[in-house]
Amino acid sequence: MHWTTNMDPKIKELELRHNPVIIRVNKFDEDSASDFAAKMAMAHNTGQSIIPVIIDSYGGQVYSLMSMISAIRSSEIPVATIVEGKAMSCGVILFSCGNEGLRFVTSEATLMIHDVSSGAWGKNEEIQASAKETKRRNKKIYEIMADNCKKPKDYFY
């Protein structure tokens, strides 16, 4: 695979203290979010100038996605997001969190976004609370993506 960009030539003359960390994301659950945070922390100790995050995912849990976004936002090293295969649902939101100029999609890849889904059940009040939370999460992820894409807050909804 070959990616091109207008990257600073100094990046090519990089000396690493350890093997670079490359993060692969194929699901969004508590375990993968924890692993993601650990690998982001490891990457800060390698001397690498960019943290590549390769996404090939159908999506998953929004709360786990939010944890991954927090790890990216707190990174002192630029994060490149690369889609191979697919970035659907949570995957496309995470893709948008890569630093500007460091978001890449292979020509064979597919991106797909949709509203947050919920499996609400229970008493009327519980269903209403779940619907309210689903609406809040949906608005939040669309605003994150709009901000990352330099669009108005309500661009995606």
Where do the protein language model's features map onto the residues?
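Terminal-region recognition feature
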Residues: 1-157
